[in-house]
Amino acid sequence: AAFLCDLSVAPSQAATIVRAFGMEMSASILHAVLAQRADAIIACVDTVPQRDGSCEARLTILECPPVATLREIAQACWDHFEPSLRREPGLWLWAYKHFRHKPHNTTVEYPFYANEWDAFDKLRAESGIA
């Protein structure tokens, strides 16, 4: 079985906090739950458009220690993708608002659309960040 993971979800849903581009965001834990409970493999797929109009898909199996927490697994997924996003930002769906929520009283600059939300701070505390 396979599914496409939505990396950004509301902090009130099945989420944890991950760091991305120097900011915190709430991210799905569903792929991490499947990896832990069903011993599922997490395959990260990068796609790169080719000059002939085709698309090259590069699959990497994410290696996670058996003792990794859901947050650590979710962070490892993001850590896999962030370097390629930094190298080729034009290939990412920037219109999608990944940083909808931000911590109260943060000094980090977030996109204009990010809002403070109590549920985000609660998730940060539950994740051991606050």
Identify the function of each model-found stretch.
Residues A1-A130:
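Non-catalytic C-terminal accessory region of glycerolipid acyltransferases
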